[in-house]
Amino acid sequence: MNNIQSSSVQALRQQRLLLEIEYNSEKEAFRRQTETTGLARKVKRGDAWHPLRFVRSYYNSLNQLSVEVVRTADTDIEHNFEFGRPVCFFRMSEAAEGKSIRYFNFTGTVSYADGDRLVVTVPDNAPVAELQATEGLGVQLFFDETSYRLMFEALDRVIGARDNRLAYLRDLFYSGVPAAELSFAPISFPWLNRAQQEAVNKVLRAKDVAIVHGPPGTGKTTTLVEAIYETLRRESQVLVCAQSNMAVDWISERLVDRGISVLRIGNPTKVNDKMLSFTYERRFEAHPDYPQLWSIRQAIRKLRQERKRRDNGWHQKMDRLKSRAVELELRINSQLFGEAKVIASTLTGSASHLLSGQKFGTLFIDEAAQALEAACWIAIRRASRVVLAGDHCQLPPTVKSIAALKGGLGTTLMERIVARKPSVVTLLTVQYRMNEQIMRFSSNWFYDGRVESAPEVKYRGILDYDNPITWIDTSESGAKEEFVGESFGRINKTEAELTLDALKNYFTKIGRQRIADEHIDVGVISPYRAQVQLLRRMVRKAEFFKPYRGCITVNTVDGFQGQERDIIVISLVRSNDDGQIGFLSDLRRMNVAITRARMKLIIVGSVQTMTRHAFYKELYGYVQESAGI
């Protein structure tokens, strides 16, 4: 084993140890939460639905037993159920000693989730009739063993790789050895700006790895779509992945708009005919051979119910039916995967049995800066070269264990490669979203002042003679934060009132008719879930906001990643005598928050508390300077 190989293997073994710490920490936290957290709190947190109405059970097109349920209460609470997450069903019953919860002895996997409807695939032997008859039925998220198992398997495989492409990429990513490039004259793409053209050309020249670093509003997705389109002129098929289902949906939809055939493994987070049209399950159902396959599957299920005389004739018939079903499944899959130019999935979804044995020339990972390194290796093992796109100055991957975080588990593969191989990185430098004054602080602090505004957005605004960025100081208002629990964080009731007062005042200045005519939209952001829920309740109850509810979104910073609004109002919450700001000291979150605004940014928070931190002191000074104070 040479020095480079030894170094990379050692680093990945350390990654595995840190992942084990995170796994054990999260599993213990889940166990503790399950045992000690009341149902009402789980529902409020979005981790459980109760009560449920059982809608139906059926076999889906992939021959999986599925259960459909809807929640009948607390429909205003945003939930955390999404495709691929494990869940368990329970019943709430009344006993002499009070209410008790009994869990059913099986787990399922979410195959579809929207606002109030959930479809869960369950084992064939799941007691569906009992579920249907249960009063007080509920469902809650279960600990996600699968994602960890896939990450551990991926790390073990890459650690053990010898004398193959995976081993080469592993050693390259952990060394200072330059990545290989092809040499050819740059290709012109007149519809892209100079940095975007450079990024696409760098992707095309890369033999090993390329990185598209896209600060807010710089057209990262546009650039990535063009790079994929051009790559497909040279390769028959590529794999496109992202950490979240939402990110996979977004890039998939843009690729379809570009005229590229996409096959989406897994179900989308939002449902419309366009999104569903390129999912594997919908394409499978639409195949001409599917009705025949469905009939054979029904015959197999019917035959299994014949318990009396399972003689040789029964077994021969069952074998014939199974053989024919497998033959049809293989034929359908061969055609579906053969016709698609892009296979799209989450990083963990790339481990699907549907992709068993498949290799790709190029893997594109979008939002790579939000993914744990171990998750990236799940997909990388299927590819010869890798293109990463994202922004490590925005939201990081979620790491809950402080020990794992301090050990470096939160350091992403994208960050490692950027640090070791700056020559493979292209920074996109023209943003098309924000007024110049909103953008400038972020550009200076996070991107060395290299990001500029496109002329068409530089001076965009809503009101004449209006300062695009405002800070409303709550220091003298009596606003104080309150701790409301580990999962929800903190609230600041007075600040919530001041936040909505600021929005009311601005709406009044704009005028109701103009807001409607110009479809002006608003985002209200807070770092804390409890404050978000408080603000949502206040918006719902306030008569003033009744005409505007369709244009106002209230969410956490994470919930706004990748989105933008004409007006953004940020409630910082923290207000204390000690200058404690908690995870607001992770400045990447604030970079996301302040760069969601196109034309107006209003920050509401305690100057006395926040400006004890250098970043917020600088930001407040910048706001004052912009206002000419």
Role assignments for model-derived ranges:
Residues 77, 109, 333, 555-556:
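Short, conserved secondary-structure segments in the cores of folded domains
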Residues 281-323, 380, 594:
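ATP-hydrolysis module of ASCE/P-loop NTPase motor domains
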Residues 234-236, 244, 334, 348-629:
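Conserved helicase motor core of SF1/SF2 NTP-dependent helicases
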Residues 2-18, 74, 78-201, 257, ...:
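Pre-ATPase regulatory/linker segments immediately N-terminal to the P-loop/RecA-like helicase/translocase core
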Residues 93, 98, 124, 174-285, ...:
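ASCE P-loop NTPase helicase motor core
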Residues 89-91, 346, 571:
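Residue-level recognition of conserved beta-strand edge/terminus positions
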Residues 68, 88-90, 109, 119-121, ...:
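Beta-strand cores of modular interaction/reader domains in eukaryotic scaffold and signaling proteins
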Residues 1-83, 147:
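A helicase ATPase "motif cassette" and its flanking acidic/Ser/Thr-rich regulatory loops
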